[in-house]
Amino acid sequence: TSRMEAATRATAQRKTQVATEANERHKATNAYQLDIPLAWYGKVATWQNGNTMGIYALSGSNQEICRLDALRNGETYQGDDTVLGTVSLGNGASVVVHGKVLPYQIAQTISGRTEKADDTYSMDEAVELVELATGNRYAYDQIKHDLVGKDGKSDKATKLEKDYLAQTLLPSIKAEN
């Protein structure tokens, strides 16, 4: 009987933990709601200002991974960041996800190809940010050696980050009721 009770308690605790994680991953503005990717759970935090939401690393860098903006029908994104994805909310509005292409930017910074003062990362931060931006699908060394290349173009790294977000974050974005 004690084994059965222990198993029942363990199952109940696991269900509670899963529900807590799901609740903590769920975020919402007045215009949309989303779920933070499971691979980011406990590693990122969010900030919100109206219908703009930023997702940033909890590491010492506090580097923003991406930002989401709700746009009304006919509006277009006017920022300097790379558009990483767009989701129609079905009500005439959409959410644009944008940000720096972190795998590319970090590899360029570490290899000395950029001199922007705000683009400095410790190796630990570089590794963590690449893992967050790619969902642990690529390691920092792979990005540095395989994807950035000598031509200085970010196309492959951009595709990698867009593909990851398209599979994880974008499908969770829905209109807020």
Task: Go through the PLM ranges and name each one.
Residues 99-177:
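Surface-exposed amphipathic alpha-helical segments
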Residues 35-86:
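Secretory pathway targeting signatures of secreted, lumenal, and periplasmic proteins
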Residues 21-36:
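Short aromatic-glycine motifs in intrinsically disordered, low-complexity regions
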Residues 51-53, 93-95, 147:
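Hydrophobic residues embedded in beta-strands of well-ordered beta-sheets
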